Amino acid sequence: MSKLLGLFMKKLYKALIEVLYFIYRPVFYVLVVVDTTILGILTIALSFFDPTGNTVHYIGVFWSRLNLFLSGVRVRVHGKENIKKNQPYIVMMNHQSYYDVWAVIGYIPLQLRWVMKMELRKVPIFGLGCE
């Protein structure tokens, strides 16, 4: 009987998690759109007053960590101590999801500069931001 009860509890727990995820997922997307919009506007405004890019970088770190937190993802970085200051690096992301961008911006101690295909400059609004 206790085995049957344990199986029932596992199924009940799984169903509850699925319902909670179904409810939270659209909330998460709305939160990401809202925080990205607010922080994006703040970043654009402050970028005119910060030629070093430090402020923009720290807003990006905050944005990335906030979105990872909201999504429930924990990031663990191994080998961060091997990154030397004042040395250039090439960091490539495969964009399997947006999480790789958030993880790299939020947890790798580098100020990134982005490289993209020329064709992406033709995308409305996005391309304008790359000028």
Show which residues each predicted segment covers.
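N-terminal membrane-anchoring alpha-helices
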Residues: S2-R74
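Catalytic core of membrane glycerolipid acyltransferases/transacylases, capturing the structured
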Residues: L39-F62, L68-S71, H78, K85-E131
